[in-house]
Swiss-Prot record:
This is Sec-independent protein translocase protein TatA. Coiled coil: none annotated. The Tat system comprises two distinct complexes: a TatABC complex, containing multiple copies of TatA, TatB and TatC subunits, and a separate TatA complex, containing only TatA subunits. Substrates initially bind to the TatABC complex, which probably triggers association of the separate TatA complex to form the active translocon. GO terms for molecular function: protein transmembrane transporter activity. Residues 62-76 have a biased composition (Polar residues). Keywords: Cell membrane, Membrane, Protein transport, Translocation, Transmembrane, Transmembrane helix, Transport. Belongs to the TatA/E family. Residues 44-57 have a biased composition (Basic and acidic residues). NCBIfam families: PRK00575.1, tatAE. The chain crosses the membrane at residues 1-21. Residues 44-76 are annotated as: Disordered. Signal peptide: none annotated.
Length: 76
């Protein structure tokens, strides 16, 4: 995907980012990106643990059955 990028391409991209955001804002931007990535990784790991737990308990759950109570209420 990014195999065609060389060092010069990355240097130009970095220069454009510096021009757009300015040097003083970059540390705050990097901090917020790092926090977002940490939260994302935590959520992914939590979902994996939940998936493993479900597999250990038998996998799927039984679907809910309709008792017909809701259709009786709508007809009144």
């Amino acid at each position: 995907m990014l195999g065609g990028l060389t060092g010069w391409h990355l240097l130009i991209i970095l220069a454009v980012i510096l021009l757009l955001f300015g040097a003083p804002k970059l540390p705050a931007l990097a901090k917020s990106v790092g926090q977002s990535m940490r939260i994302f990784k935590g959520e992914v790991n939590e979902m994996k643990k939940d998936g493993d737990k479900d597999k250990g308990e038998g996998g799927s759950t039984a679907p809910a059955t309709d008792t017909g109570a809701s259709s009786e209420q709508n007809s009144k």
